[in-house]
């Protein structure tokens, strides 16, 4: 899983005009101010007086609205008016804007208003009114009503608007209806504002309880006394360092004696048996374990502190066991106790529940309340039990600061310097570990609530929605789902983007009865529509604009994200398109999608390492914590903390993936060279996409990415994945998909052999770099939109073409080894172009996108070659053949046939064998729609963001999209530039008929 900065602002008077500034530049709305200005400024003033807002300045109305949007300040206001009016545990905080969480908070506030102030729906606003800024005047109306209640007035705070004749409320005030136009700009511009970058930013994190705990820590632990003036003549570097050492040691003594021992002796031990065991364990958590830790740490600190201070009575402690290494420096003490500090993870995660439960017992259980009060008095405690239980969390956060300050004041030549630097890293690592554990604990609760809100989502036994990773973004998106033959219509959907899957829902806000008063409040509920596995999706980073209707391409511009999905059936969804009204929202979603994709498929981090990794959840064990094998730091969080390599078994953080190469690959490569005759990973039979296989055993995998099936089940092969695995689905339940290992299946007698797979080769064990952990539990829904237009290409469906070759590869022995003629087996594939020389291949592939390829037979060399378009150039690779008739591009990767070799490199990066080629064989040239410019076209000026594509007569234009075709426009690419162009300016291009006129660069050799 925040960086905050503030911008300056100005106090505005009542005579100014509203100018909302976005990104410190653009004036987006301007209207003479009247009552509307008075209202929001009055509301901001009232919230400041109520101590909910902590800034003494006004920003713009847009900034003010943005900080109310997540509902946290409203919940804080509710608890200011009525203490504990909203359960603190229910208030949801998030690092990124989440409509689901924000609307939940707003709904809690609405329920509070109905429960405690009997507000009617007419006096309330909905979550949509605030979050989407559809009715900000309603928000001000509700808050104005609350400002006139006795709970507010009793605090001596003036209400708003400040009128002499209305002291009971403003629910019927016309000023809220007269100025609706003032708030209309908020809806269009709210997405462009980051509340953390406004003048109000710091208030969103200023939790009053945290501030109170900080003050309490200072009183109990720090207990600062007046010290010498920093400018004192004797304030030498040594004295400064000694003061740091004393502060560290003295505060540790105070922490143990004044906080931990007091908790244990005054409350923890006496209350055992008085408070029910389950409640007792929640309230105190593992405080005893923390007390043991710090008692030992304090004892170990004594000797290094005395040595550092130069005290004469410093006596080295005796080790209590043969294996114990007694710390000699302050830094070594903290390094020694790193793993024990992880006990704070459980304590800090439990702290909110502890505070809530103890407060409830103090209010509702007279017997327990009386005992706690008596124990407080008997122990002469200046602070309550709840206050003391918050101190450990505050103490933990101080260690990195104290050690870092001591490090700064320690000379570089000091023998203590190195251990201090390491101690700072260790304690920062520990604090990050605790933060991630607390964050994941909260995130899992949120995801469980999301799962409950999707009313018709049916999950398999022992599988939860949070098993698919963290939620990286959620919100309403207009989305189209298209198949090979149907272009889907854009529909409003609610998307939950997890690390591993995209869950598609439809918002269905229902009215739920309140348990206490019979009132009703809107809650977030959804109906399940579909789900998509991130590892199966390819995100188009270039497509960004879509243009709809009107007489010109510049009208109704929408921002889009396009994702494609490998599927062969006509009724299976192959493309997802997200539509957005503005670029900022699109960029947010693109960033989140790329994050999810990168998490499950971190290919950019794996370059040249040969690791084969899977996104992995490491077992959380504070006694023996998982650490990264590269940096030796902790694997943080409760799930999917990092990656594990299947070859060398290394555990790694994401950022450490590229720092160390896989040693297992070197070993296996050597073994392959020395013994090509045997490969334990080679399957006993050949299967291909579209085949039907039969399960030869039951499989109930613990890994959610694998398919669950019973012996005898028939399974269809959807996609070969390498490493003797494929993605398959049950014939009797095609909604269930997942990985299947070849050891668990056998060939069906009715299997159709339609082509070879890379899994069949001796190199089959060299799997893709990222192990694809597909989903097995989320059902898919087929698209059935009869009104959609066809998307099929000129070649039609691949399945019909492949079916004709069903018996070609029945036996590997029948494949001729001789390669001095065109192999009829190869001719069945779209990528094979027959006889073609190097120059012709270059002119054919000129200008095509990266990864476009063809396979050709060179009559001159009597060899088969692959020609590939890459970075505005055409690369050629000769397919070599050994004495056994096997083929290869590199001798470490041997294949039985050319078909097998090509299929392998369609899903595996060529960088494995060619350092200069960072691509796979993506698209056969025959499937690439290529046109030739018949007129010059110059993009209009200004050509903002390269929306239009310029070209010259004779240029080769690759068609990317037919969007805008009904208005005479296509989207295409020339070299590495893309954009819209008039479709009448090009004609179909066929190298076969235009070969003589195509520009050809002579070469010295032909292949």
UniProtKB/Swiss-Prot annotation:
GO CC annotation: cytoplasm
Disruption phenotype annotation: RNAi-mediated knockdown results in male tail tip defects.
Keyword hit for Zinc-finger: yes
Residues where Phosphotyrosine is found: 183, 200, 217
Keyword Repeat: yes
Segments forming domain Calponin-homology (CH): 37-151
Record domain SH2: where: 831-925
Region described as AC: 151-239
Low complexity: compositionally biased ranges: 782-814
Reported impact of residue 200 to F: Leads to a dominant hypercontracted and uncoordinated phenotype
Chain positions covered by the region annotation Disordered: 153-176, 778-817
Domain of life of the native organism: Eukaryota
PTM entry text: GEF activity is regulated by phosphorylation on tyrosine residues.
Chain intervals with Polar residues compositional bias: 163-174
Keywords recorded for this protein, A-Z: Guanine-nucleotide releasing factor, Metal-binding, Phosphoprotein, Repeat, SH2 domain, SH3 domain, Zinc, Zinc-finger
Domains: entry comment: An acidic domain (AC) contains three highly conserved tyrosines that are involved in the autoinhibition of GEF activity.
Protein's name according to its UniProt entry: Protein vav-1
Species annotation: Caenorhabditis elegans
């Amino acid at each position: 899983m925040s960086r905050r900065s503030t911008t300056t602002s100005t106090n505005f008077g009542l005579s100014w005009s509203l100018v909302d500034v976005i990104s410190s530049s653009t004036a987006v709305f301007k209207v003479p101010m009247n009552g509307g200005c008075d209202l929001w400024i009055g509301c901001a003033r009232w919230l400041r007086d109520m101590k909910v807002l902590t800034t003494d300045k006004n920003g713009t109305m847009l900034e003010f609205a943005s900080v109310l949007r997540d509902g946290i300040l409203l919940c804080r206001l509710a608890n200011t008016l009525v203490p504990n009016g909203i359960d603190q545990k229910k208030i949801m905080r998030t690092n990124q804007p989440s409509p689901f969480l924000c609307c939940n908070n707003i709904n809690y506030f609405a329920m509070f208003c109905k429960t405690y102030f009997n507000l009617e729906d007419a006096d309330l606003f909905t979550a949509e009114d605030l979050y989407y800024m559809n009715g900000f005047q309603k928000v001000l109306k509700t808050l104005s009503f609350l400002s006139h209640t006795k709970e507010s007035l009793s605090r001596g705070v003036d209400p708003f608007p400040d009128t002499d004749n209305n002291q009971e409320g403003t629910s019927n005030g016309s000023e809220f209806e007269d100025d609706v136009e003032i708030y209309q700009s908020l809806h269009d511009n709210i997405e462009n504002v980051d509340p953390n970058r406004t003048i109000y930013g710091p208030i969103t994190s200023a939790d009053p309880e945290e501030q109170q705990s900080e003050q309490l820590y200072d009183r109990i632990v720090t207990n600062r006394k007046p010290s010498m003036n920093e400018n004192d003549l004797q304030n030498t570097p040594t004295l400064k360092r000694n003061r740091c050492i004393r502060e560290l040691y003295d505060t540790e003594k105070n922490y143990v004696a004044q906080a931990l021992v007091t908790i244990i002796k005054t409350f923890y031990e006496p209350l055992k048996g008085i408070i029910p065991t389950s409640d007792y364990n929640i309230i105190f958590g593992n405080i005893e374990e923390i007390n043991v830790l710090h008692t030992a740490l304090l004892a170990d600190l004594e000797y290094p502190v005395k040595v550092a201070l130069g005290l004469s009575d410093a006596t080295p402690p005796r080790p209590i066991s043969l294996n114990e290494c007694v710390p000699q420096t302050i830094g070594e003490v903290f390094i020694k106790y790193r793993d024990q500090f992880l006990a704070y993870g459980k304590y800090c995660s439990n702290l909110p529940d502890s505070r809530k439960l103890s407060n409830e017992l103090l209010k509702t259980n007279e017997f327990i309340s009386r005992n706690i009060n008596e124990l407080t008095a008997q122990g002469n405690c200046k602070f309550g039990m709840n206050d003391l239980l918050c101190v450990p969390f505050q103490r933990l956060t101080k260690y990195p600061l104290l050690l870092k300050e001591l490090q700064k004041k320690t000379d570089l030549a000091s023998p203590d310097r190195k251990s201090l630097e390491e101690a700072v890293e260790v304690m920062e690592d520990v604090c990050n570990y605790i933060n991630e554990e607390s964050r994941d604990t909260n995130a899992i609760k949120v995801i469980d609530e999301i799962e409950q809100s999707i009313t018709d989502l049916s999950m398999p036994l022992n599988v939860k929605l949070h098993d698919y990773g963290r939620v990286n973004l959620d919100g309403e998106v207009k989305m189209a789902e298209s198949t090979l033959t149907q272009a889907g219509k854009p529909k409003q959907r609610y998307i939950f983007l997890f690390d591993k899957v995209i869950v598609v829902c439809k918002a269905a806000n229902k009215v739920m009865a309140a348990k206490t008063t019979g009132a009703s409040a809107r809650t977030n509920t959804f109906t399940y529509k579909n789900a998509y596995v991130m590892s199966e999706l390819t995100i188009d980073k270039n497509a960004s604009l879509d243009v709809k209707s009107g007489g010109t391409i510049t009208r109704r511009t929408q921002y889009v994200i396009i994702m494609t999905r490998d599927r062969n059936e006509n009724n299976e969804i192959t493309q997802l398109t997200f539509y957005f009204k503005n670029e900022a929202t699109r960029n947010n979603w693109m960033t989140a999608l790329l994050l999810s994709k990168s998490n499950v498929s971190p290919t950019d981090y794996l370059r040249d390492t040969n690791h084969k990794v899977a996104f992995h959840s490491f077992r959380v064990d504070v006694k023996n914590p998982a650490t990264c094998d590269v940096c030796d730091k902790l694997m943080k969080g409760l799930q999917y903390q990092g990656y594990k390599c299947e070859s060398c078994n290394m555990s790694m953080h994401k950022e450490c993936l590229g720092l160390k190469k896989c040693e297992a690959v070197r070993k296996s490569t050597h073994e392959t060279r020395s013994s090509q005759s045997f490969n334990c990973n080679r399957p006993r039979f050949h299967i291909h996409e579209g085949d039907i296989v039969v399960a030869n055993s039951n499989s109930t995998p613990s890994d959610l990415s694998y398919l669950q099936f019973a012996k005898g089940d028939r399974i269809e092969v959807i996609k070969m994945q390498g490493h003797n695995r494929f993605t398959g689905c049950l014939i009797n339940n095609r909604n269930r998909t997942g990985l299947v290992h070849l050891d668990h299946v056998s060939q069906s007698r009715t299997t159709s052999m339609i082509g070879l797979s890379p899994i069949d080769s001796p190199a089959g064990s060299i799997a893709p770099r990222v192990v694809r952990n597909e989903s097995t539990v989320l059902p898919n829904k087929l698209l059935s939109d009869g009104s959609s237009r066809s998307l099929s290409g000129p070649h039609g469906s691949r399945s019909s073409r492949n079916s004709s070759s069903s018996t070609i590869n029945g036996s590997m022995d029948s494949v001729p080894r001789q390669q001095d003629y065109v192999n009829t087996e190869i001719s069945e594939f779209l990528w094979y172009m027959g006889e073609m020389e190097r120059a012709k291949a270059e002119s054919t592939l000129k200008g095509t996108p990266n990864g476009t390829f063809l396979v050709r037979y060179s009559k001159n060399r009597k060899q088969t070659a692959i020609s590939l378009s890459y970075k505005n150039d055409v690369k050629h690779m000769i397919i070599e053949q050994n004495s056994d008739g096997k083929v290869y591009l590199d001798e470490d990767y041997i294949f039985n046939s050319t078909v097998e070799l090509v299929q392998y490199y369609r899903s595996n990066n060529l960088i494995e064998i060619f350092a200069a080629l960072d691509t796979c064989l993506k698209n056969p040239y025959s499937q690439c729609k290529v046109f030739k410019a018949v007129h010059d076209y110059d993009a209009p000026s200004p050509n903002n963001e390269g929306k239009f594509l310029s070209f010259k007569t004779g240029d080769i234009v690759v068609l990317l999209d037919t969007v805008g075709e009904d208005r005479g426009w296509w989207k295409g690419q020339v070299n590495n530039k893309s954009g819209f162009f008039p479709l009448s300016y090009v004609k179909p291009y066929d190298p076969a008929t235009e070969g003589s006129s195509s520009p050809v660069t002579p070469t010295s050799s032909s292949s």
